[in-house]
Amino acid sequence: MPLFNPHDLRNLLQSGQRVLGLDPGSKTIGVALTDVSLMLASPLIGLKRRKLGENAQELAKIVRTQDVGALVVGLPLSLDGSFGPAARAASDWTQALSEKLGIPAGLWDERLSSSAVNRFLIKDADMTRGRRAEVVDKMAAAYMLQGWLDASRPEAPEIF
């Protein structure tokens, strides 16, 4: 299944369907979900990173129960915006997961999303390191997914 740009992916959604956002890390996959009006992304859970098939089974339950119509995965571009080995791996992983889940997918730049969330949790939320570790992945997924939502709105210019 091909990967879609934000506007095309949004246009594939049926009314009332949600979008699932993933921020895959080496140990944890942050999971976020949009509301049905596609205005707001909220953190959902952090999944332990396992083999693709195992994670796909866990995510398939969310897809079914939450009426998810599309998947957006964080793309770890290099700081200069180039498409390096990590971005290639994320793209391949996203395509494979999209096929397993049977829903269309797209990628969205996740550069510095975890850093931005960590800064917020330290400065504004005054969270301890242990508590931050519990929530940073799912919050980074929500941060990334909100960026995708904002860019994919019909009035937003096409940038991808």
Swiss-Prot record:
The protein's Enzyme Commission number: 3.1.-.-
GO aspect biological process, one term: rRNA 5'-end processing
Location of the protein in the cell: Cytoplasm
Stored Pfam families: RuvX (PF03652)
Keyword Glycoprotein: no
Function description: Could be a nuclease involved in processing of the 5'-end of pre-16S rRNA.
Family as reported in the entry's similarity comment: Belongs to the YqgF nuclease family.
Record's protein name: Putative pre-16S rRNA nuclease
